[in-house]
Amino acid sequence: QYNYQQTGNFRTTDLNFSVARVGDELANYLIGYGFNVVHDKTYHDYPAYTGSYTRSKATVENILQSNPTDIIIDLHRDAIGSKSNYDPSVKIGDDVAAQLMFVIGTNGGGLYHPNWQTNLKFAIELEQKANEMYPGLFKTMIVRNSRYNQHLGKAATIIEVGSTGNTLEQCMTSMKYLSKVLDEYRK
């Protein structure tokens, strides 16, 4: 078995020990709150990162044909560096949760991205709601000059879940709180 707490470019195709497992946790919580969820676990970055956004774009477009939505969450684990034990976490009640971080793409790289300001607004509002409910759950968001397929939705974002130093349990705990924030946000 693999330990989720690895560093560098460690990847596994074992869904029980990857960010896909964290996505399962988020999906289960959101379904419990009445959200309609499609959780795709296709490996787009294995065996290589090159071309992963092209491959994932095709997957998302196919999903959107039969399940139209504006909310698209692309969960990642932040790979801080190969020698880092950095584990951004926050204590919420008796729980230790991995901190989350939005990564929002823009049209700054020259690619068509008409929704980037709407996506940014969504992330800002969700982060504000999270700060009201669970201060420290989110780190400061990053805005980049790439679009990360976020042009496909009006509430599309990457959410980095912890880092290579966080445990799987901490990352899964974060999903409990993220799902509550999403539920409150939509009310």
Which residues fall in each region the model found?
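Second-shell loop/turn segments in exported
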Residues: 6-19, 42-54, 60-61, 108-117, ...
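Non-catalytic propeptide/linker segments at domain boundaries
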Residues: 1-5
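Active-site-adjacent substrate-binding region
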Residues: 115-142
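Catalytic-core regions of hydrolytic enzymes
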Residues: 13-89
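Active-site-adjacent mobile loop/cap segments within catalytic or ligand-binding domains
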Residues: 138-187
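Envelope-exposed proteins and targeting segments
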Residues: 33-35, 69-71, 96-100, 153-157
